[in-house]
Curated annotation (Swiss-Prot):
Belongs to the MTB12 family. One of its GO terms (cellular component) is extracellular region. It is found in: Secreted. This is Low molecular weight antigen MTB12. Keywords: Secreted, Signal. Residues 23-48 form a propeptide. May play a role in the development of protective immune responses.
């Protein structure tokens, strides 16, 4: 009988452990635990990416461009990449004539100073350009527009304005 009691006690213990395990499983079977996040701050702005620097040329880039345009040893036919839309044949001949005439009269070389470079419309910038030369009593300053079309160049309107000013 002792053996029957041992078996009965073992079965009872196994049943108790099984019941306990079943109870734990049934608690877990109730579904996953869902945690809800409580907002702490209302109306706080999210950090933004820093603003990108405006696309503007350097004074050295623009001065180099202007020096290239004013070089009497290079034909305007080869300066098309320096002016928006290029330089047509007639325009090149007129500009070459005016530049050679200026060189003959001692008006060259010209010296350029570029200041106040500001971004303008998309892909363009403006700058104050001061021009001085041997026969200029004081520097002449004009606000000039440059455009970026795969490289910085003088806008067509500014090029025509400078060409007309040079003719006076």
């Amino acid at each position: 009988m002792k053996m029957v009691k041992s078996i009965a006690a073992g079965l009872t213990a196994a049943a108790a452990i099984g019941a306990a395990a079943a109870g734990v499983t049934s608690i877990m079977a109730g579904g996953p635990v869902v945690y809800q996040m409580q907002p702490v701050v209302f109306g706080a702005p999210l950090p933004l990416d820093p603003a990108s620097a405006p696309d503007v040329p350097t004074a050295a880039q623009l001065t180099s461009l202007l020096n290239s345009l004013a070089d009497p040893n290079v034909s305007f036919a080869n300066k098309g990449s320096l002016v928006e839309g290029g330089i047509g044949g007639t325009e090149a001949r007129i500009a070459d004539h005016k530049l050679k005439k200026a060189a003959e009269h001692g008006d060259l070389p010209l010296s350029f100073s570029v200041t106040n470079i500001q971004p303008a419309a998309a892909g363009s910038a403006t700058a104050d350009v001061s021009v001085s030369g041997p026969k200029l009593s004081s520097p002449v300053t004009r606000n000039v527009t440059f455009v970026n079309q795969g490289g910085w160049m003088l806008s067509r309107a500014s090029a025509m304005e400078l060409l007309q000013a040079a003719g006076n």
